[in-house]
Swiss-Prot record:
The keyword rRNA-binding applies. GO terms for molecular function: mRNA binding; rRNA binding; structural constituent of ribosome. Binds the lower part of the 30S subunit head. Binds mRNA in the 70S ribosome, positioning it for translation. Pfam families: KH_2, Ribosomal_S3_C. It comes from Chlamydia caviae (strain ATCC VR-813 / DSM 19441 / 03DC25 / GPIC). This is Small ribosomal subunit protein uS3. The keyword Disulfide bond does not apply. Disulfide bonds: none annotated. InterPro entries: KH_dom, KH_dom-like_a/b, KH_dom_type_2, KH_sf_prok-type, Ribosomal_S3_C_sf, Ribosomal_uS3_bac-typ, Ribosomal_uS3_C, Ribosomal_uS3_CS. One of its GO terms (biological process) is translation. Part of the 30S ribosomal subunit. Forms a tight complex with proteins S10 and S14. The lineage of its organism: Bacteria, Pseudomonadati, Chlamydiota, Chlamydiia, Chlamydiales. Gene3D superfamilies: 3.30.300.20, Ribosomal protein S3, C-terminal domain.
Amino acid sequence: MGQKGCPIGFRTAVTKKWRSLWYGNKQEFGKFLIEDVKIREHLRKKPSCQGAAGFIVRRMSGKIEVTIQTARPGLVIGKKGAEVDLLKEELRKLTGKEVWVEIAEIKRPELNAKLVADNIARQIERRVSFRRAMKKAMQSVMDAGAIGVKIQVSGRLAGAEIARSEWYKNGRVPLHTLRADIDYATASAETTYGIIGVKVWINLGEKTSTANANTGATAPAAQ
C-alpha cells in the first residue's frame, strides 16, 4: 500500500501533522470541512500566495486561524501589511467569521516537495526541457541534504502524440517505511499540447519517534 497510497495521508498522525486542526460534531463537521476547502481554494488563486506550499487551518471559539507556509513571506505580507490585511478581509467575508492569518517561512525551499513540483511545472510551461528541469531540481534537492528524491512527469511529454510517464530517482525513498519522513506533492503544467502532471517525493530522513509528528524533529536515515 505504501507504493499506491498518498505518502502524506499514509503517515498522518504517525510522522505527519494534520493540516486541519479542529474538532466538529455531526452537525458541524461537514460545514467545517467545506469551509476549509473554500479557504484553501481561495488562497491558491491569490497571486500573493503563489509561492505557498501549504495552508494549516485551526478553529477556536468562533475564530479561524490560517497559517500560510511560504518561501516568500514578503510577497504574502505585502507593502506595510496591505496584502495580508486584504486576505483577512476576504476570508472574513467568505466564512462570516473572524479570521487571523499567520505566515510561516519555509527556510529551505529545496526540501519542500510542493515548491519543487511547482518549480518544475513552471519551467515546463516556459518550454524548458522536462528532463533538464527534473535533473536540475533533483540535484538541488540532494545538495540541500535530502536522503533521497524521486520525480515523475506524465502527459504528452515534448509534444509526443502518445502520453507517457518518465521518472528519475536518486538516493533512498522508502514509501513502505512509516518512520521515514517522506514529503510528497503534485503540480500541473499547462502547455499547448495539454496538461503535464508532476509528482515529487523527498525523503528527509527518519523520525526518531511517533511523538515527533507534533514537533517535526527528524534524524538522519541510516545509510
